[in-house]
Design a protein with these regions (language model features):
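Short capping micro-motif at the N-terminus of alpha-helices
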Residues: 11, 34, 53-55, 99, ...
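Gly/Pro-enriched, hydrophobic low-complexity segments
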Residues: 28, 93-195
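Intrinsically disordered, low-complexity segments enriched in polar/charged residues with Gly/Pro
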Residues: 1-2, 9-10, 21-23, 29-31, ...
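A short, sequence-level motif marking secondary-structure junctions
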Residues: 13-20, 38-40, 58-61, 152-154, ...
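Generic detector of short, locally flexible boundary/turn motifs and exposed helical patches
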Residues: 2, 7-11, 48-52, 62-68, ...
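Flexible, processing/modification-adjacent segments and terminal tails
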Residues: 36, 41-113, 139-142, 188, ...
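N-terminal mature ectodomain segment of secretory-pathway/periplasmic proteins
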Residues: 1-49, 83-88
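A generic structural signal for short beta-strands and their flanking turns/coil linkers
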Residues: 19, 80, 116-118
Length: 199
C-alpha cells in the first residue's frame, strides 16, 4: 500500500522479466492503472478523466531501452552493455556502504541522447542494496536526484526482497510503499498489461 498525504491506498504491482509492468490501485472506489507498459507503449489512467492515456513516444522508447533490467540492472550487466564502477565508500543512515556507479543505455530527453547513470549503495556486511540514486532528467526538479530507499528485507522463495520502499528527492520526505506480499511467477493473462480499448 501507498501512503499518500496520510491516506493509505492499496495497490498491486506486476513486473515481468520481459519489461511489461502495471500498478493497479483503487482510490475512493475508482479503479485505475499507473506506470503501465505493455511492451510497446507506456500508459496510465488520467486521475481527472478516468480514461487511459498513452505517454509520449519518448517515454515509451526510454522504457524499451530499459527492458532486461528486472530484477536488477547489475544482473549480467556486461551482456546488457552496461558498465559498473566502484566509487568511494559512503554511509547510508549510519551504515557503511559500497557505492557503485552503473552506466546504462542512454535515455532520450527532448530528442537528444543523454547519459543514464544510477548509483547503488550496498551494505558492506550484508551486501543488500539500501539506496539507489539517479538524476531527474525532466520536470520541475530536473537536475535533482531521485532517491529510492530499501528496507524491511524478507525472504521469498529463497530470495530477499525489500518490503518497504521510499521514493524521494533531496528536498522531500518522499512516498512510502509498504508491501504485504510478494508472489513470484504468478500466472498473468497475455493481455493483462495492454492499453484498454473502447468496446
Amino acid at each position: 500500500e501507498v501512503d499518500a498525504q496520510g491516506m493509505s491506498i492499496p495497490i498491486e504491482m506486476y513486473i515481468m522479466a520481459d519489461g511489461r509492468q502495471i500498478t493497479n490501485m483503487e482510490v475512493m472506489g475508482m479503479s485505475m492503472s499507473q506506470d503501465a507498459f505493455d511492451g510497446t507503449d507506456v500508459w496510465s489512467t488520467n486521475f481527472m478523466t478516468q480514461s487511459a492515456e498513452k505517454a509520449d513516444a519518448e517515454e515509451s522508447e526510454n522504457k524499451l531501452r530499459g527492458i532486461g533490467e528486472y530484477p536488477s540492472p547489475l544482473l549480467d550487466y556486461a551482456d546488457k552493455g552496461y558498465t559498473v564502477e566502484l566509487m568511494e565508500d559512503d554511509v547510508v543512515d549510519g551504515v557503511d556502504c559500497y557505492k557503485l556507479k552503473v552506466t546504462k543505455t542512454p535515455l532520450i530527453i527532448e530528442g537528444e541522447e543523454v547519459e543514464n547513470v544510477e548509483y547503488y549503495y550496498f551494505d558492506q556486511e550484508s551486501y543488500i542494496p539500501l539506496k539507489t540514486e539517479s538524476e531527474m532528467r525532466s520536470g520541475p526538479e530536473k537536475g535533482g536526484m531521485m532517491i529510492t530507499l530499501y528496507s524491511d528485507y524478507q525472504e521469498v522463495d529463497g530470495m530477499y526482497f525489500p518490503f518497504s520502499l521510499t521514493f524521494k528527492t533531496e528536498d522531500s520526505d518522499g512516498q512510502l510503499i509498504e508491501l504485504d506480499t510478494i508472489e513470484l511467477n504468478p500466472v498473468v493473462a497475455d493481455d493483462f498489461f495492454n492499453f484498454p480499448t473502447e468496446e
